[in-house]
Amino acid sequence: MTSGIKTYNGAVNVDAYGQHVIPIARTLQQQGFGIGVVSSVSISHATPACAYANNVTRADYQDISRDLLGLRSISHRFNPLPGVDVLLGAGWGADASRDNGQGNNFQPGNRFLAEEDFARINVANGGNYVVAVRQPGRSGSAVLMDAAWQAHQHGDRLFGYFGAQGGHLPYKTADGKYDSLNRRYSDADILENPSLAQMTRAALGVLSANPNGFWLMIEAGDVDWAAHSNNIDDAIGATFSGDDAFRMVTDWVEINDAWEDTVVIVTADHGHYFVLDQPETLAGPSASPDRS
């Protein structure tokens, strides 16, 4: 969708002949646009990856993160990509000692971002990104907004890394609570993570400083993950979270009177079937017939 070609399953902006193709975000970046990628799931999962990176397999998470963050990767060994201006998502705490789906340069630790890469991008170490990461006892929203303000003030890029178990933001269920049947979230999980809408707000705040305009991809990726799990409650809640993010975008456009210069596209990259093995439960308890 981002590069306008058909290719084999699992490819990230690589065509059927193994050649790199350029997604629209990189074309716009060459024209001076700011580029942002935001997701409720892992920072280098399929949709964030396809927004910007090149790789022969979507499973090569650490190398895809390198493309997104402007570091040397297996796909760009000698001339790394410029990197996106804003990258916000999950994957924090998702550690692994090995990952057979990734390449030989996989580093044990976080599956999606190697520790040395995380250190290298930080402005505190001479990198290009103000870093916001999940912190014990601190509001994730506050941590992210503080970093976004700093990035906006100093003209830096913004990287935000959050998440709970499973490599995504905590699921809000259909009733707006965090009471998923598949997972149990602690109070810390809820406090220390921003919502997708709050991530969207932070991204808009940083990217809007670019006078040339910007391209921003926002993914409610946990809708897909919940549907894969056949969990209607989580899927509905995740859809609502995506709707909140969409409203954040349209409110921003309204406040800035920017509809003449803005295109907002809402789409899905694929659909799902649900398997209802007990459809009668959706109707609730049945009433006994009145035989009088």
Feature roles, as predicted:
Residues 1-65, 74:
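Active-site nucleophile/metal-coordination loop of metallo-enzymes that catalyze phosphate/sulfate
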